[in-house]
Amino acid sequence: MGEMSKSDRLMAAIRGEAVDRPPVALWRHFPGDDQRPEDLARATVAFQRCYDFDFVKVSPASSFCLRDWGSQDRWTGSMEGTRDYTVHPVQSSDDWRELRLLDPADGALGAQLQCLHLIADELAGEAPFIQTIFNPLSQAKNLVGAERLPVHLRYYPDALRAGLETITETTCRFIAAAREAGIAGVFFAVQHAQYEIFSEEEYSLFGRPYDLRVLEAAQGLWLNVLHLHGTDVMFDLLADYPVQVVNWHDRETWPTLADAKEHFRGAVCGGLQRWDVMVLGTPERVREQAADAIVQTGGERFILGTGCVTPIVAPTSNIHAARAAVEHG
């Protein structure tokens, strides 16, 4: 088989067709750079040019979609490259009803659209790129604080629903604008479909309906990735979401890659443990774990990656090893 383009390779993997090699993609945060669209675009493209992955995940700070509602955050040295929230604008249940619809062309959302256009211009079709979208419940968590979200959900459900409506509509508007920038899909990050946080009934009421409305806004795009964050995830509850790829912490929680293929119709993305292997391991260990993932999946309907963001302290030799692990011979 001749060498396939990145897009053709991914499309074939999603459909379960033969590929010249398994696709591979890692992504990371760029703390500091993620505060300015030009710098985030430059860092994202440089990372891609260094490692030549099959798709590019654009990773802004999670606050990009919240700053215009008053959220504030700062980087305190997290090895994941993520930022800590210092101001939560929702202080009482009444504040959910005060959230206003945002214009995606303005403020922090507009800056992220600028970043996407810069990336599109620089990549010029050499690799598909996808925009991170945090699901409405994840955005709500960062607006009110992680500890208070379950309280509001259980004691002020109508107020929270009002906020989720505004968040959902704003997110759909942003995706519509991001499509114009040339994204191939969205990386849809779901953080609360975990049994240690909510019950299936709670997620079915406060997560799933809003998730599906956001994903409806992304329909027609060909590389939508569902990311299930954390452990003890509600995989089966979300396995029917209209996405082409699912990514989760497969080395840390059920299901395995092989099991997931029995529950999800598209491609599974994972195989590499991000801390013990990508950060603390050696290139040899990376190659061993990648080989195991390929055996688990038969190299079909499979994209090699980490279960979540690659820490910013991962040795470059390990990242190069992950990229090389899918090459034949």
Predicted features along the sequence, with ranges:
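Segments that shape or occlude catalytic/ligand-binding pockets
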Residues: 37-62, 66
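Active-site loop segments of alpha/beta catalytic cores
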Residues: 1-31, 43, 85, 103-329
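A contiguous, low-structure linker/loop signature
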Residues: 64-105, 118-121, 125-129
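Short active-site-adjacent helix-start/loop capping segments
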Residues: 32-35, 57, 64-77, 139-140
